[in-house]
Amino acid sequence: MKIVIDAMGGDHAPFVTVEGAVEAVKNYDIHIILTGNQPLIENELVKYDYPKERIEVIHCSEQITNEDKPVISIRRKKDSSMVVGLKLVKEKKADAIISAGNSGALLAGGLLVLGRIKGIDRPALAPVYPTAKGISVLVDAGANAECKPRNLLEFGIMGSIYAEKVLEIKNPKVCTVNIGIEEEKGTELVKEAYQLCKEGPFNFQGNVEAREIPNGYADVIVCDGFTGNVILKLTEGLASSIFSLLKEEFLKNTFTKIGALLLKPGLKSFKKKLDYTEYGGAPLLGVKGVLIKAHGSSDGKAIKNAVGQAIKFMDNKVLEHISEGVSSLGDDEFE
C-alpha cells in the first residue's frame, strides 16, 4: 500500500509532514511517498531513524500556498507537491493522498484531477465531530456552500457508509440539520432533502437542531457546506474559549489551583477528546480516490493518524461501498 503525503502542505511543513511520515512507517506496514522540495525534505529525514526503503521522495519545483487561488493554482502549478500527489493517485501509482495544504485547492484538485464517483454530483468534506456520546461525522463541512436537495441525499449515503466502515458506528443515525425537528420546518432545501432522505438507503432519523449536535443525537450530521463550516468553526472556537475561561478561573487563588489539580486527569481526557490530531483529517467523500484533508496546523501526530485513517478507508473498501450505495438509487436520481 502506497500513500502520498504532500510534504509542503500545512502551516508547519515540511517539518511535521516528514515527522508524520516517519511515525507512519514505524506504525503501519506501508510505503510513503513525500512530494515536495527534495533538499528540504531530505534535510528533515536525516534527523530520524526509520526504515529508509519505505519512504520515497519525489521532487517538485512548485508549491501551492494558502494565498493561491484554488482552481487556477491546480491548473497552472502542474509541478506542485499537491498536484503531483493527486496525479500519482489518479494514475494508480499511489493508493491515497494526505495534504494539510490549501483547502480550496485540494478540494478543486480532488474534482479536477481525481474526478467524481459515478452518480455523485457533489463530493463532500466529512470531518469527525466529537460529541458527548463519542464521535459523529459532519457532511458537508465546507466543500459546497450551495446545495440541491439531492446533494444532501448523497451526503447521507456517503456519511453513513463512512461512519459504519471507518468510524465503526453500527447502523448510524442520519439527521439533517434544521431549526426544528418538525418535518415541515426549515428552508425549501432542507424540507425537500428530508423527503428524499426518508426514502434513502440509510437509517434516517429526521431533523436535528444545532443544540443537539454536541449531545450525539445524530451519528451522521447532514447539511450544506456553508452551514457545516459554520457549525465546525463555531465548535472549534467555543472549545478554545471554554478552556481559556477554565484556565483563567483555576488560576484565581490557592483553592481554585488545588481544584484544578484534582480535576486535571478529567480535563486532560476531555481535551484529548476534542483534539483534532486524534482523528487525523477529513476525507473528501465522492471522488475517485482516497483523499484526506488534514488540518492546516496539523502536527506530526495528526499526519500519522491521517495515514491510519486512509489505511482504514482502503481496507474497508469505502469507495466501492459508496459507488454501490449510489447505484442502488438508480441513475435517474442523479441525472
Curated annotation (Swiss-Prot):
UniProt xrefs under Gene3D superfamilies: Isopropylmalate Dehydrogenase (3.40.718.10)
EC number: 2.3.1.274
UniProt cross-references to InterPro entries, sorted A to Z: FA_synthesis, Phospholipid_synth_PlsX-like
Enzyme class: transferase
GO terms for biological process, alphabetical: fatty acid biosynthetic process; phospholipid biosynthetic process
Biological pathway: Lipid metabolism; phospholipid metabolism
Keyword set, alphabetical order: Cytoplasm, Lipid biosynthesis, Lipid metabolism, Phospholipid biosynthesis, Phospholipid metabolism, Transferase
Top-level taxon of the source organism: Bacteria
GO molecular function: phosphate:acyl-[acyl carrier protein] acyltransferase activity
Principal location class: cytoplasm
Subcellular localization: Cytoplasm
The protein's assembly and partners: Homodimer. Probably interacts with PlsY.
Family: Belongs to the PlsX family.
Entries under PANTHER family matching the protein: FATTY ACID/PHOSPHOLIPID SYNTHESIS PROTEIN PLSX (PTHR30100), PHOSPHATE ACYLTRANSFERASE (PTHR30100:SF1)
Protein's UniProt name: Phosphate acyltransferase
